[in-house]
């Protein structure tokens, strides 16, 4: 085991503070509408230019191990805020820096660190409760677009495209961000339920120009097993032929003579039919078949519930307005399922999302949720160069997280104003002793830091602006983009309450713990020997290289 170096008390905290400030100073340069960019070196390819706080934080590693520990702890604040709300990383870093700087001054002045921490915790709880009171629900497209715009560093085109995507696929819909091929951002929406399985035979295609099989007003037969024997299918096929409607078969697989017979019937025009494999595997396949059944008002034919293909009737089949199959995907549009059943299924899946611990399962469950509740939208990010594309894509993802958070917990006035208004909640707050009161006062100063930093980045005088904002009421604040004062919500400067709350909670949690640090332990840096090869002691003569005659 390598030797360790231990630092105590002030000397440890000073080193830690250096690391905190290096990281936070780099990150906070990006805050606000007039925040600057940070250029990150990459081991290969062009450097990356970013205004995303967490991207900057992730790049920073310091040579001095004690300083690095301070930097890594603040990095954790940014990551924690990012994990919970997907945005607010820069704000969280600025808050953490303010808490640590103010807190370590108080510790150096002889205050009890544990009481300071208790004071900070008490004030945090009060401010979080007040932020919830300040929050207004965010339901209309205009507010959603404004939240997206602010999060994407005042880029209104990003805010508008996210608002449009949310309007089209609903609040529960899945919105994914991909790299586009043009200069403009594009939005494409898949309405209805789409799953990644295509037709089992190209002979099902009835639109050769687009290479798709399209069924209008079809019946859907959902089967939880392989179908290889056509005899099992005959009763259903005859009933469907009499009804004169097309049929889509969704089964674990359709093979052999069953598939051949379906193809022949389809080509002769006896029954218009198409077959597709069920999506997913194992238990997930059963769950997804059940989703399709609920969406279309059908029943899954499964031996587990005592149903077999031979006994299946038209009552067991689902209905949809249209089904489109191509080589890779199947889309079911306007299933005829009961709204109450769909809502119950959505609630059940939402409960599973809350209960699961696996990120993979959570993602798959959310996909199922979106397919049932709305649809899937894809935002294709357009840019002139690869470097710009990466930077823009990161901003779109941030803005998307922010708008989701806004829909979830509402919005508060942006630009650091919500913190200043929430201070009323702790104006009368008292701790159990003087040191706790110092902790409360310390947080009171720290929550002004985001507003101060926004003003500094905009080239203004922070103290003057903070004072003026404090004199105002409600949503009155400072618009750094236009250097004006006014109603933040009317000017469209909104922050999601969830982002604001989780930024403070992450900063207070880690910041207050850092104040209570008394010792730091790190490995002793080894002095590596100077580079270069060892002395070769004069490489003697190479002898006569005689006898090289016969070489051509």
Swiss-Prot record:
It is found in: Cytoplasm. GO terms for molecular function: ATP binding; ATP-dependent protein folding chaperone; isomerase activity; unfolded protein binding. Its EC number is 5.6.1.7. It catalyses: ATP + H2O + a folded polypeptide = ADP + phosphate + an unfolded polypeptide. Pfam families: Cpn60_TCP1 (PF00118). GO terms for biological process: protein refolding. Transmembrane segments: none annotated. The keyword Isomerase applies. The keyword Chaperone applies. Its main location: cytoplasm. GO terms for cellular component: cytoplasm. InterPro entries: Chaperonin_Cpn60_CS (IPR018370), Cpn60/GroEL (IPR001844), Cpn60/GroEL/TCP-1 (IPR002423), GroEL-like_apical_dom_sf (IPR027409), GROEL-like_equatorial_sf (IPR027413), TCP-1-like_intermed_sf (IPR027410). It is an enzyme of class 5 (isomerase). PROSITE patterns: CHAPERONINS_CPN60. It comes from the Bacteria. Together with its co-chaperonin GroES, plays an essential role in assisting protein folding. The GroEL-GroES system forms a nano-cage that allows encapsulation of the non-native substrate proteins and provides a physical environment optimized to promote and accelerate protein folding. NCBIfam families: GroEL, PRK00013.1, PRK12849.1, PRK12850.1, PRK12851.1. Forms a cylinder of 14 subunits composed of two heptameric rings stacked back-to-back. Interacts with the co-chaperonin GroES. Belongs to the chaperonin (HSP60) family. This is Chaperonin GroEL. It comes from Stutzerimonas stutzeri (Pseudomonas stutzeri).
